[in-house]
UniProtKB/Swiss-Prot annotation:
Name of the molecule in the record: ATP-dependent dethiobiotin synthetase BioD
Annotated Mg(2+) binding sites: T16, D51, E112
Xref: Pfam families: AAA_26
CDD domains linked: DTBS
Family under the similarity heading: Belongs to the dethiobiotin synthetase family.
Gene this protein is translated from: bioD
Localization (cell): Cytoplasm
Binding site for ATP: E12, V13, G14, K15, T16, V17, D51, E112, G113, A114, G115
Keywords: ATP-binding, Biotin biosynthesis, Cytoplasm, Ligase, Magnesium, Metal-binding, Nucleotide-binding
Species: Bacillus thuringiensis (strain Al Hakam)
Amino acid sequence: MSGFFITATDTEVGKTVVAGALAGVFRELGYNIGVYKPLQSGHVASNPEGDAARLKVLSGVPTKEDEICPYSIEEPLAPRLAMKRAGRAVTLKDIIHHYNERLKEFNSLFVEGAGGLAVPYTEDALVIDFAKELQLPLIVVARPTLGTVNHTVLTIAYAKAHGLTVAGVILSGCKECEMERVQENKVMIEELSGVPVLGLLPFFEGEFTKKEVLESAKEYIMISKLEEFIRNESTVAHTSSN
């Protein structure tokens, strides 16, 4: 298996934009990359305002929204609670099954979780349990502002305590007027966690286009560093299969 698991320090931090943008950039580079977000609350998968639709647009994958996100519900709650209130039972086995189905189409998948790693996810698992099953390197998306050092370092420590590899951090929503503080936060996160901050993605105000997002990702995220992970994972997978 290869790809990345995109998680965050909180909800509404920018995971979907980062996941979609990275997938779109890698697809432009010629990689057969897909996107997968198994559970979504707040919108049904087909809603153009929802994460599944945004992932499809930004990544440029041919996959239908309800295949990108097989389980979605309108109520904006933690996925486990939202599904329970809707009378739907979704297990870890279910979402892994759909993950394997997507791998029949793509060589690698960029998987987006929900909120942070300790979010109640399926009826029998937290987000981190799903990440542990996949064993993909993590990309942690975080806010660039006050409080982010604590939230980010704790997220990384939690991931490492569960045996997961953290490829890097991306600070999302960076404003030019705050860049001095953002840079200070970047340095502190790297010093305290031992994990590199691979990008400072700008704040997108109002409506934005796919082109704007992908160009920003190319300019502000260390794509070459992430590409090394994809190549290394592919090499390991090829070696293991021989």
